């Protein structure tokens, strides 16, 4: 499995799943959100977003 570095600090909630490739994810200000549906390069998604869902699926930020 790919290296996953997604430590969640107290006071924050992380959306990074077990199979996400988030590096140094700070939950209070997670800049590398793991989107399950947004296509790679989605300008509205967090930069460095690791997308695991099918390209046919779109989340609210991409609609």
UniProtKB/Swiss-Prot annotation:
GO terms for cellular component: cytoplasm; nucleus. A divalent metal cation 7 binds at residues 51, 59, 61-62. Keywords: Metal-binding, Metal-thiolate cluster. GO terms for molecular function: metal ion binding. A divalent metal cation 2 binds at residues 8, 14, 16, 27. Gene3D superfamilies: Metallothionein Isoform II. PROSITE patterns: METALLOTHIONEIN_VRT. A divalent metal cation 4 binds at residues 34-35, 45, 49. Residues 31-63 are annotated as: Alpha. A divalent metal cation 3 binds at residues 16, 20, 25, 30. Residues 1-30 are annotated as: Beta. It holds the Pfam family Metallothio. A divalent metal cation 6 binds at residues 38, 42, 45, 62. SUPFAM superfamilies: Metallothionein (SSF57868). Transmembrane segments: none annotated. A divalent metal cation 5 binds at residues 35, 37-38, 51. A divalent metal cation 1 binds at residues 6, 8, 22, 25. GO terms for biological process: cellular response to cadmium ion; cellular response to copper ion; cellular response to zinc ion; detoxification of copper ion; intracellular zinc ion homeostasis. Class I metallothioneins contain 2 metal-binding domains: four divalent ions are chelated within cluster A of the alpha domain and are coordinated via cysteinyl thiolate bridges to 11 cysteine ligands. Cluster B, the corresponding region within the beta domain, can ligate three divalent ions to 9 cysteines. Metallothioneins have a high content of cysteine residues that bind various heavy metals. Belongs to the metallothionein superfamily. Type 1 family. This is Metallothionein-1. It comes from Columba livia (Rock dove).
């Amino acid at each position: 499995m790919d290296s996953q570095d997604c430590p969640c600090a107290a006071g924050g909630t992380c959306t990074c799943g077990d199979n996400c490739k988030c590096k140094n994810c700070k939950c209070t200000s997670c800049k590398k959100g793991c989107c399950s549906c947004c296509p790679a390069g989605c300008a509205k998604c967090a930069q460095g977003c690791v997308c695991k869902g099918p390209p046919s699926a779109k989340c609210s930020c991409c609609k």
